[in-house]
Amino acid sequence: MSSKGGSSRLGSKDLKKMTSRTERELRDSGRVRGEVERVEKRLRATAKVKEQPPTGDYKRRALASPGETAAPTFLVDSRGIPRKTSSTAPRKATLRPASSSPRLASSSRPTESTLPSSSSRALQGASSSSSSRPRRLHESASGRGGSGGSAGELRQEKKRLPELEAAEAAPASCVVELRDVTARKGRTSPATPPETAGSSVCGQGSHARTAEKLEEGTASHRDGSRRGSVDAETWATPGDGSSSHEFESSPQREERMQPQETGRRELSSEPRSGDLTKNGGDGGPRRHSCAWRKWREHMIQSFDITTHPFPPRGDGSPRRGKFLMIFLTSSVLFFVFLQELVLNVTTFNGRCMSPVLYPSHDAPESERTPRVISFGYGACEHNLGVSLFRREETKKDPRGRWTPGPLTERCASGRCASDDGWPSDLVQRGRAQRSPAAFDSPNPRVFSSLGALDTNKVRNYGEMFRVVWGMFLHGGWMHLLLNVSCQAQTLWILEPAWGFLRTLSLWIVGGVSGSLLSAVANPCTVTVGSSGAFYGLLGALVPFSIEYWDHIASPAWFLFCVSVLVMVAQFGNMVGVQGVDNNAHLGGLIGGLLFGFATIRSVHAFRWQGVAERMASSTLFWWMFPAEKRRSLREDNLQRVAREREERSSGRIPPPKFVWKFRGHEREWCVRFAAAVGLVTFWSVLWLYLLVPSYYESLSSPPGNFSFLGSTGCHCCRVQPFPGEEDKLPAFHPVRVNRGLFWCFVSEGVANLFCGRSSALNRGADVYGQTRQFEEALGDLPSARAGEAPLRIAKEEGESASVWQRLVKSAKKTYNAVLGNTTTPAAPSAAELAQQTRAGQ
């Protein structure tokens, strides 16, 4: 560019740049002009719909002319509370939403004639005094030339377009996230109250609430969700210009009005108590209703109460972070089972974990002294007669007579984890302790070492931890996966509604209840597994369905399916499945059922009238009710709902109680109290029969594990030698070593031998005084100690009973046990014992 004689000449490049810039500005100005015209058109349409005469004590005079208004000016502070009103003379005014003020709405909006035409391409101010008015959104572009203004002004207009779009939208406080708690779908949808004559877009009574807030001044609001609703429901129209106020921006206001609670919210569209008082009504009931709502929100915020069991569908996973109990229990159970496998390998199937080497019993006397092997598995290899790695074959040592055994491999689980006990050439009768393993489980011998539920060790050695720790162990991969999958499916329903602490307490109570009943009713076997806790979750589904009766789509069907599932699971295991502890299942079911009712939040929704109506309308029970009865039930239920709604609306409800979540109903407290007493009684009786000798000794013949084929039988007694054989038994005989213990045996013959009811010495006894009968009886001990409980009836020798005879015998035994007619064989007298001994000799 060059300058000469006061004139300037543009170069070709500069001229191109200016031309392209001018074309771009013209194109942008046309686009902006079109957007402004569309926004102004929508504003005029909205103002025409909203222009209705106000009602109430604060009626405004009709507009004298299309461009005049006599509405008072409502000025609000930064918190959204009205501070001052000015009633000025009518003056010419047009709609001018302020850029820095929140989006406001009022019933006295200007008419279509008060708005500028679309050709003006600008929104004019509402007052001639620019010093006292808020900043304009758009400058008039009529005097800017054909281009529609400079480039800076065009950019400003483009920036203000979103504000114009927001100005014609509904106020933010009118669209409240309202969770429909009566609908069973549990969805969340933005809800707006209906428009009525004399009310704004946000609901009825906006002018009355506005006037009340003007009188209150800086008084605090009754409801947090109602804060800022007046400034969102009233469009600010400047007055005489005596005072101006800088409003907070809409994003700041929306952030301030963000609700803190995650539960339900209600629209604050009902009139306040002051409105009723001014109109001649009684504001007391409204105060109670408002106090109730405030108390409910306080409880939700303070205690994080879940008011709806089914979270709404939204962005992302609505249940994210809701299943801590599922992941916690599953991970713990898997970790403990892996520890079982590790211990099964390192202890040689539970047979050896000590570094002490015990020489053979036929070794020279000078070499029979046990010794400690400080490193390696040499001690266990010698004691078990195996070798873990290939060694050079050597001849037998003439002094120690020890040669490395055959090469063997250790397994964590499966058939290879089975063993034949201890070698007979090293351990007397070592082969009698044979222990087989299932295809998916470690050797059952390790369960007792890991802390499985063993009633005999709990009573005699005080190992109380077995009552709790036994439910973390599992017998195999199939057992573990089945329990974890069933628990996850049940916790998927319970945990989002009941929360982590309540669900964790339920899981522990169910597991301990199952362990207690199993330990008392079947003390002969070793029990592992968390199926008792799972049945506790199943039992809790019954109070869950009653507690959330109004939120479940088909609660009657849900309750029916839960009942059928429990019966099928319980009775299915009683058909003849071996290795299943039905006592633990039954105890967990009772514990979970009682705990669920003891902690139930409300039984308010479970009324017979509503239940009968649901049953009459269901496809399962409709045939039980005639058509007239079904119609009558439905009408009665609708009348009851309408009556309760009228009572709540009129204020005939009691003030909020302290314990809000329990609703304070006497019937509900009776249910909780009865269930809590039942649970405490159930636990107390079981603990007494588990730990107190005077109680469990009176139960000498517990029922054992039961099924439709009968029961396994269980026989308990004090271990003692047969009278007259105390000095004849060897020093390390099992009877002499364990003398005085109260032990329970599966076989009645074994119990008679160890409890002194039958003689262990007989013709043909070996060096230890053990007869063939005694050795055969000992064959039942490995299965009893290893936790294998074959489902059979304990019968006398030579007795062959059919299935029908077993059922009859089991029924008679149960009948006698219930009536207290169980006969225990009396201990023989000294004369009878002497006579039996002489006859045997």
UniProtKB/Swiss-Prot annotation:
It is found in: Membrane. It catalyses: Cleaves type-1 transmembrane domains using a catalytic dyad composed of serine and histidine that are contributed by different transmembrane domains. Residues 1-289 are annotated as: Disordered. Pfam families: Rhomboid. Residues 1-10, 95-132 have a biased composition (Low complexity). Changing S531A: Loss of activity. It is a multi-pass membrane protein. Its main location: membrane. Keywords: Hydrolase, Membrane, Protease, Serine protease, Transmembrane, Transmembrane helix. GO terms for biological process: proteolysis. GO terms for molecular function: serine-type endopeptidase activity. One of its GO terms (cellular component) is membrane. Belongs to the peptidase S54 family. This is Rhomboid-like protease 5.
